[in-house]
Amino acid sequence: MHPRPHFFSYAAVLVVFLAVTLASAQSQPRPHTKVVALDRAENGILPILTGPPETVTMKSGYVVLEPGRSVGKHSTEHHEEILIVLEGQGEMRFRDGSRLELRARTALYCPPETEHDVWNTSAETLRYVYVVANAQ
């Protein structure tokens, strides 16, 4: 009995598909190590990691807030977020009215789907690093 002609057609298509998929996967840039100086974000945000292809899923930034300033309300959406406070004091304010104190050498965690804002409530500059990663 001879194999059906369609079998060879399907097999050829499958081989081509696998070859293209493998070549595409190998051509995707892979994350690599890097160093970012945290000295250019005066009165703002300096992106440290901007996500794929620079990382797998992670994004981060260095934030500098002058007294009385905030970053603006935003949500973590489908990300987890951690803030590492380097210098200064402030508050993380949540939609429900609750607040967490920020101060130097502390870290704060925000789970996914958390609306929040960061305020500098002191008379000195607030500096922190945030890191977000996909929680799904």
Per-segment meaning from a language model:
Residues S70-G72, T76, E91, A107-L108, ...:
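Histidine-centered metal-chelating micro-motifs
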Residues P112-Q136:
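Ligand-binding loop in jelly-roll beta-barrel domains
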Residues V20-K59, E66-P67, G72-K73, R99, ...:
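A short, N-terminal "cap"/entry segment at the start of jelly-roll beta-barrel domains
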Residues Q28-R30, R93, R103, A107-Y109, ...:
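A beta-strand edge to alpha-helix "cap/lid" segment located at domain peripheries
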Residues Y10-T21:
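Bacterial N-terminal signal peptides
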Residues S70, E80-A104:
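A short beta-strand-loop-beta hairpin characteristic of the jelly-roll/cupin
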Residues T57-S60, E80, E113:
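Extracytoplasmic
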Residues M1-H6:
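N-terminal secretory signal peptides that target proteins for export/translocation
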